[in-house]
Amino acid sequence: MDDVAADPSHPRYQSLLLRHRLEQAEQQGLLAGSAMIAHGRGEAYDYLLGEQTIVSAHLATLYALDALKRANHPVLSLNGNAVALAGEALLKLAERLDCPVEINIFYRTPERMEALLGRLEAIKSELNLDVKILGAEPNARIPGLKAVSYTHLTLPTIYSV
């Protein structure tokens, strides 16, 4: 990562580093114009919540992981911010879950898709991961994939508060 003019003792240092990574990703064509707004909205809530993961958010994360583990055909659906900030971690997760990732973005352009797919392919190659990357074809359908309601699932008791 390029040098960023941020003092490591600054209370929002990690936030500044993430913001810088998004700035770089935008320059590389990975992000939509609204990406910084979306990230900033999340950062505002993080700040208001005291920079801590609240119990309900932690439980939601565990619930999502449990749903992915139980799914017959899980797929991790990624946007530009996810690729820019957590592409490596998400590809590693996909390999552990034995599932593909897909680029699924609202503001789709051929250039942006090429940049996002290229970034994921580079990470995949560098880490020697066995993960299928979907999304190159704009009208493609994933066989057997249907919208699912998770209201019938119950959270395992180990995740209860």
Q: What does each model-found stretch correspond to?
A:
Residues 1-102, 110-112, 118:
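Electropositive, gly/pro-rich neighborhoods at or near active sites that engage anionic ligands
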Residues 96-147:
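Long, charge-dense
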